[in-house]
Regions:
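Glycine/tyrosine- and acidic-biased, solvent-exposed loop/turn segments at the edges of beta-strands
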Residues: 18-119
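Bacterial Sec-dependent N-terminal signal peptides
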Residues: 1-24
Length: 119
């Protein structure tokens, strides 16, 4: 019984680690747009995380695509390292709060969207 519990705990810990380590991460500039859908290589729309950096100055953006469309939370930074804006998408449509920041990184305004429409 003790061996079964140990094996179960081992599987419980290792399987999620393997699954999450397989998630793709790609530089945004490597993607190709065709008719509003993003592709990395091949014929299948890209699914996975993307990022981009300013040349020698840190992060520019992070986000995620699902089936070639923006999905989930996206964050953009200014060259000075301060947050520029935060966006949220669901299957390519604007969804949730979009937060904009000024040059000092202070929240300037919030726009709310649901299924691509301003609310």
């Amino acid at each position: 019984m003790k061996k079964i519990i140990i094996k179960f705990l081992f599987i419980l810990v290792c399987v999620p680690a393997l699954i999450f380590s397989q998630q793709q991460r790609l530089m945004y500039e490597k993607l190709i747009e065709k008719k509003g859908i993003m592709y990395s290589t091949g014929k299948k729309p890209y699914t996975g995380r993307v990022f981009d950096n300013y040349r020698m100055k840190g992060r520019k953006l992070t986000g995620e695509f699902r089936n070639g469309k923006k999905h989930g939370n996206w964050t953009y930074w200014k060259e000075n390292g301060k947050t520029d804006r935060e966006e949220s998408y669901f299957e390519g449509n604007k969804n949730g709060n979009w937060v904009y920041y000024n040059d000092n990184g202070i929240k300037e305004r919030v726009e709310k969207y649901e299924k691509g429409k301003d609310t």
